[in-house]
Amino acid sequence: MSNLTQVANENINAESTSINFTKAQSLGEKLELGNPVFWLSGSFLTLFVVLAFTNTSALSELVNIGFNYSTQWFGAYWQVLLLLNFILGLVLALGRTGQVRLGALALPEMSTFKWMSIVLCTLLAGGGVFWAAAEPIAHFVSAPPFYGEADPQTKALNALSQSFMHWGFLAWAILGGLSSIVLMHLHYDKALPLKPRTLLYPVLGDRAINSWIGNVVDACSIVAVAAGTIGPIGFLGLQISYALSELFGISDSFATQSVVILFAIAMYTLSALSGVNKGIQLVSRYNIILSVCLIGYILVVGPTSFIVDGYLQGMGEMVDNFIPMALYRQDTAWLGGWTVFFWGWFLGYGPMMAIFIARISRGRTIRQMMVSISIVAPLVTCFWFSIVGGSGLAFELESPGVISSAFEGFNLPAVLLAITAQLPFPTLIAILFLILTTTFIVTTGDSMTYTISVVMTGTTEPNAAVRTFWGIIMGAVAIALISMGSGGISALQSFIVITAVPVSFILLPCLWHAPKIATQMAKEQGIA
C-alpha cells in the first residue's frame, strides 16, 4: 500500500508541476497577448504615455489640435445625437415596446435597489463629487452664454440649471439606452459576442464580428473608456492629496498622490476580481448608503430652503429650455470647454457602458431600463448637484467670496473643502466626502476593469489575470500622467474628447436599429 501511495504522490507532484508549467505558458493567453485588440489599444495608450514623458509640449500641441478639430466639426453632431438618443429611448419606453423583456430571462437577476446602486455609482464616477461641487460655482462666477449676466440670485439658479443639463437626461441616456437594447438582443438572443463590434453587426454583418473592422472598433472603445476612467483616477489623487494637506498638513506631493492612487488601484482591482455580484455590488451599495447619509445631514444642517428651491426651479428652468439648451450653438468656444467636452466624455464611455448595463440588466423590460437610466438616475444626480453645489452657491450668496475665492484658477479640489468648511463638523464631513469620492472612483474603476476584460476575453467571467492587468494599467497611466504636473492630466482631458469621434459613429446606428429590434421583439413576445 505504501508503494502505491508513493507512486500516487509522485504522479500528483508530476501533474502539479505540469499544471504549473501550463499555467506559466498560458499567462500570455490569459492576458490575450495574441489578440489584435490588446496590441491596438495597449500600443495607443503606451504611445500616449511615452509622448507625455518625452515631449509633453508636443503632445499637448497635438492633442489641442485634435481637440479643437473634434469640437468644431463634431460638436453639433454630438448634440443632435444625444438629443435623438434620449427622445427615441423615451418613445420606446412609453409605447408598447416598453413591455419587451430583455436578456432572455423572465425575471431580473438582482434586486432593483442593488441594480440602481451599481448603475448610479458606476456612471456618476468621481464627477459625482468633483463636478457637483465645482461646476455650479463655475457657472455662477462666469455665466453661461445661454443665460447671460443677471442678478446674483438668478445667476445661482441658472448655474444649477446649466449643470443639470450637463449631468441630466441626455448624458445618462447615451450611457445605457438604445445601445444596451441592441447589445442585449444580439448577445442573449443571437449569441453574438458582448463586445462593441456587435453594435455594428446590423450594418456590416459578419464583417463587424470577424474582420479587422471589429478589432478597430473594440480597440477604439477600450482606449476611449480607459482615457475616461484614467482621468478621474488621476483627479482622485490630486483631490485627496490636496485635502490631506489642507486638513492635516500632509505634504501635497507626487508621493502622496501616488499612494492614494495605489490604494484605489488595490480596491477597484480586488472588487473587479470578485465580480459583479460580489465586490462591485457591495461597494456600490455602501456608496449609496453613505451618499444618503450625507444628503440627510446637509438637508438638516445646511441651506435646506435654497437646496430645495434651487433644485425645483433649476429643473424647471432646464426643462422649460430643454431643446434650445441642448442645441445651443452660438458660442462654440464656450461649448468646447463645457457642453461638447462633457458630451465627448460621455460618448467615450458609451459602448463599454452599454456592455456593462447589458451584463447587469438581464430580465428587465425596456421601460424599466429607459425610465430608470434616462429619467430616475438623472433626477437623483441633479438633486445631488443641488445638495453639494447648491450649498456652495447658497454660502456664496450669503458671504460673497467664501466659495468663489477658493475656486480661483479653476481649482477643483479646493471647492469641495470650501463648501464643507461652512458646515458643522467640517473636518469630519470633509473626510466623509473624500471617502465617498474614493468609493465613487472605485465603483467606476472596478466596473470598467471588468468590462474591458469582458471585451478582451469574450466571456462574461474573464480570468483574474486580465482583470488585474487592466486594473493596474489604468492606475499606472494615471500616476505617470500626474508625475508630469498639470500638463499630463490636461492633455488626457482633451484626448478624451478626441476618442469620442470614432465612438460616436459606433453608437449612431443604434438610433434606427434599436427601435427596429424593439418592435421585432414585441411581436416575438406577443405584445399587442
Where in the sequence are the language-model features?
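N-terminal alpha-helical transmembrane segments of multi-pass membrane transport
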Residues: S2-K155, G296, L508-A522, G526-A528
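Helix-loop-helix module between adjacent transmembrane segments
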Residues: E10-N13, N20, A24, G28-F53, ...
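Flexible loop linkers connecting adjacent transmembrane helices
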Residues: I19-G28, E61-F67, L94-F113, I137-S161, ...
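Membrane-water interface regions at transmembrane-helix termini and the short interhelical loops
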Residues: Q25-K30, T56-S70, G89-E109, A159-W167, ...
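Extracellular loop-to-transmembrane helix junctions
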Residues: P36-G42, N68-N85, M116, L157-Y188, ...
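Hydrophobic alpha-helical segments of multi-pass membrane transport proteins
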Residues: F44, Y77-A93, S291-G302, V380-G390, ...
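Membrane-interface alpha-helices at helix entry/exit sites of multi-pass transporters
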Residues: A76, A150-A159, A208-A219, S253-S258, ...
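Membrane-embedded translocation segments of transport machinery
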Residues: A208-V216, S221-R364, V371, V376-A430
